[in-house]
Amino acid sequence: MTSSERHRLSLIIATLGPSTDNEKELITMLMAGIARQWTDGVDIARVLHSDGEDVAKKRIEIFREQSKKRNLSTSIYLDTDGSDMDKYIAFGNEISPSIMSFDISNGLDFFKMVKSKLGDNIKTCVRVKHGTSTDNLDDFFKECDYSMIELDSKIIHDDKIVTRSKDNMCEPIYLALMPTLMKGQVQSREENFEIGHTLEEGFDLIALYQETSHGPYAARS
């Protein structure tokens, strides 16, 4: 895939939150394509179980309902900042997301067994947070379908994170940080450069967290 093809096909995973609880804002995001792969119109929404089960379930229901009304093929990416994995897994099996993310701090043995506790159609993702050692990442990549990479761009490049993930049949996702979008509608030149440079590493999926869940211009993000 060439660089131009990669950017054209990139998916954006947008986090739902208070900003998108405004249904008009959510609809605007859907119609703009919060994660549009131009070849087949896929949209992906990240929902946090740790925001509360009732809240998460309502966000998922509304997202799916609005997507169905517009004949959009959508996906749910379920994540959590919580520590109760049993409750999280039970919720995941109930709502059946396309992807479920688990923090790397759960340990390798956890990742080796978690798929057996999930529905057959749920893909697993290892969440690699800022500051995580990259030494043993390959072992985790081997057990997962996706990896959420929240590392600095220099580490991503120097430690060949994208190549290592893909070599283990684990699709890497890049967390794009654009703090200026928490205040305005346009990201900074530095943020654009950082994201563009990192995408050249070979990411085909990009995630937005606070920018869409809590930012004043969620759809614009």
Which stretches of residues belong to each language-model region?
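Non-catalytic helical/linker scaffolds that mediate oligomerization, partner binding
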Residues: 1-221
